Amino acid sequence: MKKIQVVAHCLLDPETRLAGLRPVAFAAEPPIIQLLCPEAGCLGLDRWAVTKNQIDIPSYRRYCREIFSHHADLIEQFAKKGYEIEVVGVEGSPSCGIKSTTLGYTGGKIRPQDHEHVPGMGVFMEEVTGELKRRDVSFRLVEARYRIK
C-alpha cells in the first residue's frame, strides 16, 4: 500500500520551532504533506513558550481548524485513492503532541514558571484527528521524539 506522511511543520523547517529548542531528529519518507505551524502562524516566530492549557481556547482551536481545512481536503482524496495516511506530531508539543503535551503555565506577569510533560494530545493534533475522523479517513499516529530518556 502507498503511504503519505502528514507532518508537523517544524519537522521539516526547524526555524519555526520555539527559539532555543533543538531540532527534532526526523527523516521524512516522501511523499509528504507539511502542515502549517499553528503556533508560529498565530503567535509569531518571537513567541514565548506556551502550554496546552494556555492555548486550549475556542479562538486557537478555530484557527487550527481553519489552517487544516485545505490539507484535510487533499488528505481525504489521497485516502480515497488507497494511500495509508500517517500523521506525525512532535513529542511534548502543546499543539502537535501525539502521545505527550505540556501543562502548567498560568499566565500573569512574566516570572519563572514550571511546566510538565504529561500524557495527551496537543490542541492542533486534536483538531487534525477530529477532522479526519469526521471525514471517515483512516490514519496512523506517530510522535517524533527529541528528548533522550
Predicted features along the sequence, with ranges:
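Extreme N-terminal starter segment of soluble prokaryotic enzymes
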Residues: M1-Q5
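Short, well-ordered beta-to-alpha junction loops that form the rim of enzyme active sites
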Residues: C10, V90-P94
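Short, well-ordered, mixed-charge alpha-helical segments that flank or form enzyme active sites
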Residues: P14, S95-K99, I148-K149
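Short, surface-exposed acidic-centric catalytic microdomains
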Residues: E15-P58
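Divalent-metal-activated hydrolytic enzyme cores
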Residues: L45-K52, I57-D73, K109-K149
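Glycine-rich phosphate-binding loop signature in dinucleotide/nucleotide-binding domains
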Residues: F78-Y83
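Short glycine-rich phosphate-binding loop at a beta-alpha junction
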Residues: E84-V90
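Active-site-adjacent alpha-helix immediately C-terminal to a catalytic or transition-state-stabilizing loop
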Residues: S95-Q113
